Amino acid sequence: MYYAVDYYADMGQISQDCFAATQTGASDFDMDELDDLDQVTQVIGYHPQFHDHFLATQNFIMKGDGPLPNDYRYYLAIIAAARHQCPYLVKRYEKEFINQGGDSAWLGGLDFIPAKLRAIYDINKILAHRPWLLRKEHIERLTKGKNSWSLSEVVHAMVLLSHFHSLSSFVFSCGLTQKLDGLSSPKLKSPPAAVAALAPTILITPTSPTEPQKGKPVLAEISLNNANPDYDSQTAASSNGGAPPDSANAVADGPDATTLNGYLATAQQLPQQHGISVETLMERMKVLSQKQDECSEAELSSRFQKVEQQTAELAAVTPEAAVGVPTNLSHYVDDANFIYQDFARRGTESINTFRIQDYSWEDHGYSLVDGLYNDVGIFLDAKFRAAYNLTYCTMGGIKNVDTSKFRRAIWNYIQCIYGIRHDDYDYGEVNQLLVRPLKMFIKTACCFPERITTKDYDSVLVELQDSEKVHVNLMIMEARNQAELLYALREIMRYMT
């Protein structure tokens, strides 16, 4: 069996914590004021190795050869983003929809679109929140009758929907739902590489204070740091009776990264959580890498179920009931009460998991999607590889650190949230390497991204560099994207056979 651990080889360092920021209503955006190079692209530009693959994939599925007409493509982007109440993406693709010659009446909502397009909405809803509920019968209903879809069209639609569901997670996690006015962080930044290349006259470095300038990169305007500058890791530690974290125990992962106390602070901000130093984390990774004993299949299964059940018991960072869908997005949303429910339930004796050994991207999904939608598999595969392998091999100034164990724990934990088990993986490593607050943020970003607030970030992260936060959010986006596609493509395969 060809597992992901072999497929995505040479996996390296990734930041230990995640970033969250505030959300605002769709009315905050004037799309005419956005640069041609949109904010999402600029943020992803912190990581050029991934940036190129992301843009190539998005351009292909939106503008390249494919079975769906342009108006369908852009409308699918709108309704996918609306499931997560993401005004930034909805407003952006409403504008693109009109620019592509779309019927403005469709922007009145789901009651104003063709019956054929309306028919795929249930799949949009299921993929966004509970992809394990998708069945081959959903595919069959789409491909039969008066307004039927071809199988190639269904695949194209599923690729689009999963892309924009996952992109919504990224947008909220990176604070791109915020207005640009008055949100500059007190921490100085360097611009993403991709942005710097496009604007060579503008340079903002951590050591060269720069006054706000008209036309400077979006990341110099958007606050991607702790919204409460008076809160620091020392305060967090002392309030819990612990010693202030040593700045030498910082973790870094990015070309502009210097120090990072966030990993320590996340653990120390909860009294019941014991923080670990970077040295301890590195030692754990080393021990896990050297471990020779192999677990039985029964033990591996038991450890997966334990982590999955712990995930079900883990509240999102904002567990209270979700607010209603904003009125300026509600016309794109049907059955708003259909949201994520934990795949695993505490006390269940058997859990119907999605086993990668039975259906994997590498052995099954890639060839199926590429066969039904020419060349898209190549783009998706390159994007997944880039996200999984992205590395600067640094940790708190220490170079040439192999943290593949840590990154694999993050990727597999994200897919565990969706009931996917990598059969060859020891899920005991997840609890060794990922602290509880990090798990909480990952779960929220995947399942309830619209709930992420500055308060959540304040209580979890301290002094992270922009590139580090973006790095983790890329992992969340791509692992989720792949999880949705695995469920979708498996049901298409079942329908075809």
Curated annotation (Swiss-Prot):
Result of knocking out the encoding gene: Sesn-null flies do not exhibit developmental abnormalities. However, fat bodies from third-instar larvae contain more lipids and adults also contain more triglycerides. Flies heart function is compromised with arrhythmia and decreased heart rate. Skeletal muscle undergo accelerated age-related degeneration.
Phosphoserine: residues bearing it: 185, 190
Tissue expression as described in the entry: Highly expressed in muscle-enriched tissues (at protein level).
Induction profile: Up-regulated by reactive oxygen species/ROS generated, for instance, upon chronic TOR signaling activation.
Ranges where the record places region Disordered: 226-255
Keywords: Cytoplasm, Nucleus, Phosphoprotein
One of the protein's GO biological processes: regulation of foraging behavior
Domain of life: Eukaryota
Cellular component GO terms, alphabetical: cytoplasm; nucleus
Molecular function via GO: amino acid sensor activity; L-leucine binding; oxidoreductase activity, acting on peroxide as acceptor; peroxidase activity; protein-containing complex binding
Ranges of compositional bias, category Polar residues: 226-241
Compartments, record wording: Nucleus; Cytoplasm
Family: Belongs to the sestrin family.
Function, as annotated: Functions as a negative feedback regulator of mTOR function.
Subunit structure of this chain's protein: Associates with the GATOR2 complex; the interaction is probably direct. Associates with the GATOR1 complex; the interaction is probably indirect and mediated by the GATOR2 complex.
PANTHER family listed in its UniProt record: P53 REGULATED PA26 NUCLEAR PROTEIN SESTRIN (PTHR12474), SESTRIN HOMOLOG (PTHR12474:SF0)
Protein name: Sestrin homolog
Organism: Drosophila melanogaster (Fruit fly)
Origin organism lineage: Eukaryota, Metazoa, Ecdysozoa, Arthropoda, Hexapoda
Gene that this polypeptide is encoded by: Sesn
